[in-house]
Amino acid sequence: MAIIGSGNIGTDLMIKVIRRSRILSMGAMVGIDPTSDGLARAARLGVATTADGVEGLIHMEQFAEVAIIFDATSAATHRENAARLAPYDKRLIDLTPAAVGPYVVPPVNLGAHIASGATNLNMVTCGGQATIPIVHAVSRVAPVVYAEIVASISSRSAGPGTRANIDEFTETTARAIEQVGGAARGKAIIVLNPADPPPLMRDTVFCLVGDADHGTIRRSVKEMIAEVSTYVPGYRLKQDVQFDRVDEPMRALLRDTTGTVTTKVSVFLEVEGAGHYLPSYAGNLDIMTSAALHTAESMVRGGDSSQEFGI
């Protein structure tokens, strides 16, 4: 496999592959800055590198053996990379908000996309990976007419790629809340928290529902958190799921075809990073790289899981 993007996300993903994966191996690390720490670390670890971007990757001798390519660049760059790589029959895992391919949130729809043979899978956003499982957990037991998520991350964990993709973050996450999470309408907000010491990633999920059994929703949410934590150990519920009666009309938030709202469900999450390359407060980046690694390994197992997967 290869990683395009030698910044924080790409480098953390490389470290995860080397340390954690038994069925993936690093074939190449691709960047555009020959002085980047990510390329230097890759070289020290014996990984082939190029600072010539996707063109450099295509011309590397390892390219023929690469089956899966992670793209950890930016939304605009991924669109260019996907077009350039299209003739080569590679499977792409997109860690940008470009959404060239279908949205993937592993515990919700990964199996379906692997079965369909999709070759470009989009990992939505860090906020999407943290919150869409919760929206789905609620919507699978009670219709969600509106869902709103707020992702609060440390400013120190927001590199140039994250900052350049703020608009794409909100748009992509909101669409995925609807298409993957199952809400009739979705909204996403991101907050860059400048506090020092840097805080852990915090996520808030609000779902508007009709009359529903609180115990059923609570159990569904806890089951989903347990599932996500199998590949993101630092993913946890910060406090009990809360239910508030809605008495005022919510017409401004609802679409015409949605039903009656009687209850607001509030879920408060915390994501602590594993500290493989990035500090533990960068849970927003850790959940993306962990979800991407889980996706790649699942793609391989969906083929022939009895064999080790090479480059």
Swiss-Prot record:
NAD(+) binds at residues 6-9, 157-165, 284. It comes from the Bacteria. It is an enzyme of class 1 (oxidoreductase). Its EC number is 1.2.1.10. The active site is at residue 126. The keyword Mitochondrion does not apply. One of its GO terms (molecular function) is NAD binding. Keywords: Aromatic hydrocarbons catabolism, NAD, Oxidoreductase. Belongs to the acetaldehyde dehydrogenase family. This is Acetaldehyde dehydrogenase 2.
